């Protein structure tokens, strides 16, 4: 299995099984499995996970904290018709074991809570400039391939792999898509209104990081205020960004 392809293979496969006559409880268990794959990918841990799989002995026991999820995946795997699907499902079970053995069960639980809410995805790092981001990436002993980071308040995905150095980062329109979807659905009432950007920034600086996001107005114009708790980062985005 090519590890870089694992998330793109596993998440759609699990989603397909969720639509295939499972009970509500079973669908929720597959949500945990799907979230585990996404958590590993978007936090830049694919290569660490790959190394973990390589070093694991065959016939290893399931992760104790995820017994129900693993039992369901094993049942689905037994019934799967293709060797490729069986391999992917085994890798998903290994993903759960990796998360538990590396002490990241709480991190996964927090990530799953993000999945259940309408908010922006978390990032693992935030930088003011491209050069700061490149320096940080050069210092990583293992490329955090797939991780989300902020560079100048813009979402980027880490694309440096073990085989390829460039491109280091790829910009992704996460903010624009989030704003665009809310403009289509209709904005919620603003939680605060300010005359100037300075007033709004002062308010945001004292807003709990757990707020995640809020819609406000500055000079009568709608803005999105975002807090990234993990990296202690706050930012304001004018809603016109989605139209650019």
Where are these regions (language model features)?
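Tandem-repeat/low-complexity and Cys-motif detector
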Residues: 25-28, 62, 84-86, 204, ...
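N-terminal intrinsically disordered, low-complexity, charge/repeat-rich segments that act as generic
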Residues: 65-69, 76-82, 95, 102, ...
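Extended non-catalytic scaffold regions that mediate assembly and binding
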Residues: 14, 49-76, 112
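Long, non-catalytic architectural segments outside compact domain cores
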Residues: 9-12, 20, 52, 213-215, ...
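Short glycine-rich, low-complexity/disordered patches
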Residues: 48-53, 86, 105-116, 121-126, ...
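N-terminal accessory interaction module
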Residues: 126, 131-244
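Short amphipathic alpha-helical heptad-repeat segments
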Residues: 2-12, 29, 62-70, 88
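Amphipathic alpha-helical packing elements
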Residues: 26-57, 81-117
């Amino acid at each position: 299995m090519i590890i870089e392809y694992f998330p793109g293979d596993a998440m759609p496969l699990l989603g397909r099984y969720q639509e295939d006559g499972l009970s509500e409880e079973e669908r929720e268990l597959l949500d945990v499995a799907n979230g585990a794959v996404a958590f590993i990918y978007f936090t830049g841990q694919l290569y660490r996970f790959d190394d973990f799989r390589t070093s694991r002995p065959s016939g290893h026991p399931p992760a104790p904290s995820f017994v129900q999820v693993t039992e369901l995946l094993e049942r689905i795997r037994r019934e799967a018709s293709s060797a490729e699907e069986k391999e992917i499902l085994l890798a998903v079970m290994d993903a759960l074991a990796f998360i538990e053995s590396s002490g990241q069960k709480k991190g996964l639980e927090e990530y799953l809570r993000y999945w259940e809410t309408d908010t922006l995805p978390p990032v693992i790092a935030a930088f003011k400039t491209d050069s700061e981001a490149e320096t940080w990436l050069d210092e990583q002993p293992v490329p955090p391939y797939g991780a989300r980071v902020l560079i100048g308040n813009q979402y980027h995905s880490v694309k440096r792999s073990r085989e390829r150095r460039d491109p280091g980062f790829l910009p992704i329109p996460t903010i624009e898509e989030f704003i665009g979807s809310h403009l289509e659905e209709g904005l919620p009432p603003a939680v605060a209104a300010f005359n100037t950007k300075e007033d709004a920034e002062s308010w945001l600086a004292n807003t709990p990081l757990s707020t995640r996001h809020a819609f406000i107005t500055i000079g009568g114009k709608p803005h999105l205020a975002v807090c990234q708790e993990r990296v202690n980062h706050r930012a304001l985005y004018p809603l016109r960004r989605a139209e650019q």
